[in-house]
Amino acid sequence: MRTDTDTWDIQTSVGSTALAVAAGRALARHPANGAPIDPYAELFCRAAGGQWSDLVQGKQSDHALSSEDFGRSFANFQAARTAFFDNFFTTTSDTGVRQVVLLASGLDCRAYRLQWPAETEVYELDQPLVQQFKQETLDAHGAAPSAVRHPISVDLRQDWSTILQESGFDPSRPSAWLVEGLLFFLKSSAQDLLLETIDSLAAPGSHIAVEQRDTYPDIEFEMRRAAAADSAEPGGSPLADFLALIYNESRSEAATWLRGRGWAAERIALLDYMNTSGFELPAYSSVGWDTLRYTNMVTAAKR
């Protein structure tokens, strides 16, 4: 059961979803050349051990993420989502932005994977135990970031703007913000507070990218959650875990909210992006299709 003050490490609650995402990224491939979408993701799964290590080594053929339906569509989802946000940062870097903020960064390794312009600073905010696991794993493999990296241990439901600025962030300069896989883990009121804080810290010329999921009708949400729990393997199911952890509340639509505060915002359905960008689509009405059709990608620039 979620509470307003719950905390987690990498193996529990919301933290465990970071490992599921890492597993999806480890299994995901670029559609153009078959290269791994995130070469660091497998390191985290192996470090976590158990099902995650077995999964990326091909030792768990009965795992949900190994299935042809949900597992394949989840990996393709991770490939598409990762590429979308990678492209966002390429674009914002080209405009001269040199401050990047990753909210609920989890096991995101863009500070290592992407080629950043000189003097780019990347601020990564997440729970302390998640940050600890990430840092220890990267250090164990001698990984070196390609930007000036600032890992910040903080709960985003608390006052994180102060510690961000104390860590070197300058609100008078343009910045690029990423809100990936986060909003549905927040209550609607916490989402509004998060967006308000970003808006207050973002100078004109700043950019933001947001993953937004539409809210399920209440009856559909309860049916989906029950069905996912009933079909889960003994070790758990990423879909069942996800549905048990999110807040399925009516909430502000990010693009509309941002436009109301002077941002020029665009929104695209993830399935449309996948279709036009060469990513494999899940079969219509499959579990994968029904999961992804609620996901939208929002980008905005502050005037």
From Swiss-Prot:
Gene3D superfamilies: Vaccinia Virus protein VP39. S-adenosyl-L-methionine binds at residues 126, 155-156. One of its GO terms (biological process) is methylation. Keywords: Methyltransferase, S-adenosyl-L-methionine, Transferase. One of its GO terms (molecular function) is methyltransferase activity. Its EC number is 2.1.1.-. It comes from the Bacteria. PANTHER family: S-ADENOSYL-L-METHIONINE-DEPENDENT METHYLTRANSFERASE YKTD-RELATED, S-ADENOSYL-L-METHIONINE-DEPENDENT METHYLTRANSFERASES SUPERFAMILY PROTEIN. Belongs to the UPF0677 family. Exhibits S-adenosyl-L-methionine-dependent methyltransferase activity. This is Putative S-adenosyl-L-methionine-dependent methyltransferase MAB_0213c. It comes from Mycobacteroides abscessus (strain ATCC 19977 / DSM 44196 / CCUG 20993 / CIP 104536 / JCM 13569 / NCTC 13031 / TMC 1543 / L948).
